[in-house]
């Protein structure tokens, strides 16, 4: 059967030979040499490959044909690879592996079948083309891509139809909510109208009963004033005389004027101002306990008060101070002083015979010894009330204990920082989520923070790194990522206000907390201002050359001064977190264990250090931020995605 099948083979090739015979082709065409290519494949993420081919020369082919071959007459294909993850391979087509045999094959074809030379040439051409282009593999890839595109198209159609249904349901639900809201708005409008009508009726009744009330109030006040005068005649006779010469009928006159104004306003149907009654009550309840007359002029007192009010740049002097004692003003009939009373009314404490020393921010300086005066706040302060003298007295004490933390919210990632501006009068909260980024999120207050309702988002021009940022006096202070630069970003005008370089800081990618890419540069704010804490080289100890440096910064230009810079004995890799209170640096020994200690303290006032060994609880065992807020006297902490505060106790 095999012998019978052999004869038809030349007949099958004859038509192809006849078709190719119409084109003249030379046997030594250069097309064959063009197809001799080396193919290289590489696999791996880090790979560099190189193929080196050494073919036989024409002289070597002639020597091999004549039987005079040498040792160096051979061809090779070498593969050279480099890289940690690399696999290389080099291959070559048959025409390139043995050029001598290729020439012998061509000569045999010329001698035995000249008509098949053209066919062999075309076969070699097609073989080289298929080998170099790898058309079958390309076809397989194209088919696979086409099938993936079809699958993707079907899934997109299904998802779009499903999302369209969700959007339609949402629009329908929002329309229903809008109708309910409109109904509630109409009800609220009716309630407001009813309340306005009732308020107008009550106002008219009060206006009708007003003429009898001031007479009684004036009489009782006159009796109280007369009784107070009778008690003080023996002690302050001369003062009473000088004070009586000035006259006291103004408060009743003002009361009558207010009653007449009340009648006019009630006739018009308007509402009373909410501040009118409290001022009148304050005047009626005043009790004169005694007077002291000084020769200092009114202008000198006013100038001294203004000068002392403007002294100091610390945030503590912007807070309303505590008020101890109760007294009346020096000139109750002064109209200018009545106008200035809601802002800051001067009170003199004369309960005892001698002047009493009261912590205050405003003192009256005259030629004779004067009692200390203080400002009366018009509304209850939101935070602790500390004056400049009280601040210095409180900072003389040291930290006695740290209470267990109070959790306020769980927000964001495991690492982050949250803070308040201690120099601000509002309760805005600022959050940096994670230890690397360029966004600062602002919340109006703690309730909005718990609800996730942010009020502002700041996109910074340069990325921050770490969790040691602070917000102070309306600016965000942070360390620029992967540099030794510190930046002050103005939050109100949204631009970089200052830029400085810490030349002696030791900056590396690894940190004492072993957070990837975290920064060792830590900002802090205490009662005295802005500070920066960073590691530097210690020339005194070669075994442990890196120590923690504490320096007070100028908030304006971020400058560092030698007289306000201290090198501590705290080593860089020996603590977890640190914070600054009243000019004393405290360091917690661990951050990833629940039971920790405040193991180190450095006092900048004396230049000495100590080991207080105070218990400190890392409740969630991953504390990435601890910062002191001098306005609230608490520590703000970020522990494994939980926002906490610690209450501090001091030894005064």
UniProtKB/Swiss-Prot annotation:
Residues 1-27 form the signal peptide. Residues 326-335 have a biased composition (Polar residues). Disulfide bonds join 395-582. Residues 394-652 form the Olfactomedin-like domain. GO terms for molecular function: extracellular matrix binding; identical protein binding. Pfam families: OLF. May be cleaved at Lys-295 after secretion. O-glycosylated but not N-glycosylated. Residues 209-254, 312-407 are annotated as: Disordered. It is found in: Secreted. SMART domains: OLF. Keywords: Coiled coil, Disulfide bond, Glycoprotein, Secreted, Signal. Residues 224-234, 243-254, 340-349 have a biased composition (Basic and acidic residues). InterPro entries: Olfac-like_dom (IPR003112), Olfactomedin-like_domain (IPR050605). PROSITE patterns: OLF (PS51132). Homodimer. Binds to heparin and chondroitin sulfate E. This is Olfactomedin-like protein 2A. It comes from Homo sapiens (Human).
């Amino acid at each position: 059967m095999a012998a019978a099948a052999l004869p038809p083979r030349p007949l099958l090739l004859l038509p192809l030979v006849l078709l190719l015979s119409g084109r003249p082709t030379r046997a030594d065409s250069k097309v064959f040499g063009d197809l001799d290519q080396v193919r290289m494949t590489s696999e791996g993420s880090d790979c560099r490959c190189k193929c080196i081919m050494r073919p036989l020369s024409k002289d070597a082919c002639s020597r091999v044909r004549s039987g005079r071959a040498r040792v160096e007459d051979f061809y090779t294909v070498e593969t050279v690879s480099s890289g940690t993850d690399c696999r290389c391979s080099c291959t070559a087509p048959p025409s390139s592996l043995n050029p001598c045999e290729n020439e012998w094959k061509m000569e045999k074809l010329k001698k035995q079948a000249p008509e098949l030379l053209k066919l062999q040439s075309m076969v070699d051409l097609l073989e080289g083309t298929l080998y170099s282009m790898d058309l079958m593999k390309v076809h397989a890839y194209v088919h696979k891509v086409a099938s993936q595109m079809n699958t993707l198209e079907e899934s997109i159609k299904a998802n779009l139809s499903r999302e369209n249904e969700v959007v339609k349901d949402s629009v329908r639900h929002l329309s229903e909510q809008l109708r309910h809201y409109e109904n509630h708005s109409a009800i609220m409008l009716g309630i407001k109208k009813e309340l306005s009508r009732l308020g107008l009726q009550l106002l008219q009744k009060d206006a009708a009963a007003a003429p009898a009330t001031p007479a009684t109030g004036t009489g009782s006040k006159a009796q109280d004033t007369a009784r107070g005068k009778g008690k003080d005649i023996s002690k302050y006779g001369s003062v009473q005389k000088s004070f009586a010469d000035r006259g006291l009928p103004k408060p009743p006159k003002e009361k009558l004027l207010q009653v007449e104004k009340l009648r006019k306003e009630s006739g018009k149907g308007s509402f009373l101002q909410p501040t009118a009654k409290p001022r009148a009550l304050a005047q009626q309840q005043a009790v004169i306990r005694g007077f002291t007359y000084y020769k200092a002029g009114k202008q000198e007192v006013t100038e001294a008060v203004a000068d002392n009010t403007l002294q100091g740049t610390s945030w503590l002097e912007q807070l309303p101070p505590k008020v101890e004692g109760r007294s009346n003003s020096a000139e109750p009939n002064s109209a200018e002083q009545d106008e200035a009373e809601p802002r800051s009314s001067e009170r003199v404490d004369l309960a005892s015979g001698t002047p009493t020393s009261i912590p205050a921010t405003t003192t009256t300086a005259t030629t004779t010894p004067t009692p200390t005066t203080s400002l009366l706040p018009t509304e209850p302060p939101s935070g602790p009330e500390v004056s400049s003298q009280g601040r210095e007295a409180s900072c003389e004490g040291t930290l006695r204990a740290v209470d267990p933390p109070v959790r306020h919210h769980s927000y964001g990632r495991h690492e982050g920082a949250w803070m308040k501006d201690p120099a601000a009068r509002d309760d805005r909260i600022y959050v940096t989520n994670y230890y690397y980024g360029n966004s600062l999120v602002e919340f109006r207050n703690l309730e909005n923070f718990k609800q996730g309702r942010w009020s502002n988002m700041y996109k910074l021009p340069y990325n921050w790194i770490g969790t040691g940022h602070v917000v102070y006096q309306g600016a965000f202070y942070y360390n620029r990522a992967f540099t030794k630069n510190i930046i002050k970003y103005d939050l109100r005008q949204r631009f970089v206000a200052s830029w400085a370089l810490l030349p002696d800081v030791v900056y590396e990618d690894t940190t004492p907390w072993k957070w990837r890419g975290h920064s060792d540069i830590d900002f802090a704010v205490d009662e005295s201002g802005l500070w920066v804490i960073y590691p530097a080289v210690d020339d005194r100890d070669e075994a442990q050359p890196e120590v923690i440096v504490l320096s007070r910064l100028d908030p304006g230009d971020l400058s560092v001064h030698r007289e306000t810079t201290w090198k501590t004995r705290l080593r860089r890799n020996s603590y977890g977190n640190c914070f600054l209170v009243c000019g004393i640096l405290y360091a917690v020994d661990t951050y990833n264990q629940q039971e920790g200690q405040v193991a180190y303290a450095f006092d900048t006032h004396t230049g000495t250090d100590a080991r207080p060994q105070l218990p400190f609880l890392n409740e969630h065992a991953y504390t990435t931020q601890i910062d002191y807020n001098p306005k609230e006297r608490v520590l703000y902490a970020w522990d494994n995605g939980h926002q906490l505060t610690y209450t501090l106790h001091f030894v005064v």
